[in-house]
Amino acid sequence: MWRLRLLVLAVLAAGSAEAQANSSDGFLEFSVGKFTYFVLSRRFPQEAVLRHISSNVTFLLFQIHSQYQNTTVSYTKTLLPSTSGTGNDRGLVFILRPEQTVCTWYLETEDTKPVQSVAVTLSYSERDPIPGGCNLEFDLDIDPNIYLDYNFFETTIKFAPANIGYARAAEPPPCDVSTGQESRWRLRYHVYQYFLPEGDLTEASLLQHLQRMAQVVQVMASAVKVVTLTADDKTVVSFSSLPGQGVIYNVIVWDPSLNTSAAYVPVHTYACSFDSVDGNCVPPGRVSTKVFSTLFALLGLFTCFFGHRFWKTELFFVGFIFLGFFFYILITRLTALKYEVRLVLTAVAGSIGGLLLVASWWRFGILTLCMLCVGLVLGFLVSSGTFFTPLGNLNVFHDDGVFWVTFSCIALLVPVIFLGCLRILNILACGIVGSYSVVLAINSYMFTSLSYITLNVLRRALNADFRGAFIRVPFQTNDYIILAVWGMLAVTGITLQIRRERGRPPFPPHPYKLWKQERERRVTNILDPSHHIPPLRERLYGWVARIKELFQKEQPAGERTPLLL
């Protein structure tokens, strides 16, 4: 019985870790290690206090988080750039004086709407490294914050170097006097990434998951370590942007000599803006993208199941991809046209590319050229999938030359491997590429990481800075379902086409030769009824004459003059 009571007390104690702040008359009281929810408003700035600080605590790290509205945390009541920080995720480090047991600071917001926030105060000892303790770039003397910047292509985080810990009342170790193992140059920085649930843009979910990224133990248990930096490296890391997908980043500074660690202030992003005019964080997406991707998916789905039988339709699909991809890269890099205009021009250019490939097959009948295009499209998807794996994050592939040469070799390897069995290559391309177009269409309606298999390659071709970005995407329940749908469509399409084409010629005959043979047969065989069909030119003249007759007035019949009496 007493064990049950202890268990209940433990659960209640754990639940109190996420409590509302004790607030009265603009006064907030915090406890070490307890996450506190409260609301900040512009009219009522708050003074925060922490009491009963233990004597073995050397410094405190306070942090406050909100979803997209800015909050300000300051050492003093008067806001100055050197004593305050403003943003969605901001924090301060408090170096404690001897015998200090109480610490105060100030919180406020300039936003007109109330800001729902969560905050926590963490304590560290003299053996723990101090995040941002060797700041030379930002305004605060000691800056534990991570500064985030994003665009459509990449998200970049940067932070100030840390310093080794020291006791109360001691002088801080110099940052750049020496580079030995007794200085801050021995420190290591582990960069972690944590994905929020896909499609979840709620404030409550973000504030809850941020609690998993504040303390060292929880960060190491919940997030994925992306890269480790030394003191010689720049404290800047880039990631591929995922618009509409919530991501939390944090940095753990580790002292290998003392085996101690400390966490910076975690920072989050959705790679989009909640308060923009377009509201681009909130679905639905662009109508133009939905129309384009849906029509493209319908053509791809038809190719997946019937592409080899309807050879010319498949060639149009392949030519559309081939020319449309390169044309979109060209106009995006060389012009400043709006997205909708570029999408329409890409659709027109892709259609021209498809018609050209069909026309070249009809006139010249060069099977090798057509299958080279088909094989390269399949090879492009295979190569994109290869670099979608952790292999793409190797440092050697951050060089554009190495990346594009390797990418091209993998893409060329696919048609070379299937050089002796072109029909199998064609059916595989129909099934895999055609079914993947459905994945791209799904991405225009709901987020799926699988679309970034090819979108990351497109981003790298469009933006030179993307080469240094780490490519990581969430793989959650929706992605497993869509991956199963993709695999099911591909396997079904390939199987049906292989069974249907048994006993048939590998490819249709040359259309132009068939047309010439048919024309010669009509000329030589006078018993053929089609021999008596007039030439095309005479038939066209006849059609034009009949159309003209429709617009001519009907002539009256009989006498035009009155009868003589």
Curated annotation (Swiss-Prot):
UniProt superkingdom: Eukaryota
One of the protein's GO biological processes: positive regulation of insulin secretion
Localisation: Cell membrane
PANTHER family found in the cross-reference section: TRANSMEMBRANE 7 SUPERFAMILY MEMBER 3
InterPro entries (UniProt xref): TM7S3/TM198-like_dom (IPR025256), TM7SF3 (IPR042502)
Function of the protein: Involved in the inhibition of cytokine-induced death of pancreatic beta cells. Involved in the promotion of insulin secretion from pancreatic beta cells. Is a downstream transcriptional target of p53/TP53, and acts as a pro-survival homeostatic factor that attenuates the development of cellular stress. Maintains protein homeostasis and promotes cell survival through attenuation of endoplasmic reticulum (ER) stress and the subsequent induction of unfolded protein response (UPR).
Pfam families membership: TM7S3_TM198 (PF13886)
Lineage of source species: Eukaryota, Metazoa, Chordata, Craniata, Vertebrata
Listed name of the protein: Transmembrane 7 superfamily member 3
One GO cellular component term: plasma membrane
Record's bilayer topology term: Multi-pass membrane protein
